[in-house]
């Protein structure tokens, strides 16, 4: 289910398992959706909210009127004019790493921002610096590759267990 906190209700469904599992959400009949010029999701759900909702969710629409979430507008790294969606980098790397990690950014004089990888410092892990660099070079577009890898004791998480992006950004600046 796709739920917007602002609506306090669900506005769409998707199958998460089985042969028909999909990353595409199907809005309820009473809900209409569209994209802003920045590709953020705009929701009109008059049965649950009096006003049109403008989200920070970067989305994609398909011909069947379904949508999928690609990431958050506030999780975009602008490196040398190239916009990099943090969640897409993480999703690409997830299947290759054995150690918890997250992507963030740091300021850079030349590029504006650079991609930074924070990884838990687990002694004995197969994820050595050299292996991390090799994986990134093999599976990511060059401009998505982390320019810096920072080992941390624990990844910063919110109280709900989600990545704490603000704290991660601060760690990347050290």
Give a label for each model feature.
Residues 42, 68-70, 158, 164:
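Generic structural signal for well-ordered beta-strand positions
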Residues 34, 104, 149-152:
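General small-molecule cofactor/ligand-binding pocket signal
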Residues 77, 116-120, 135-174:
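Conserved C-terminal "lid"/linker of ANL adenylate-forming enzymes
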Residues 11, 51, 56-144:
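AMP-binding/adenylate-forming catalytic core of the ANL superfamily
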Residues 5-66, 73-76:
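Conserved AMP-binding/adenylate-forming
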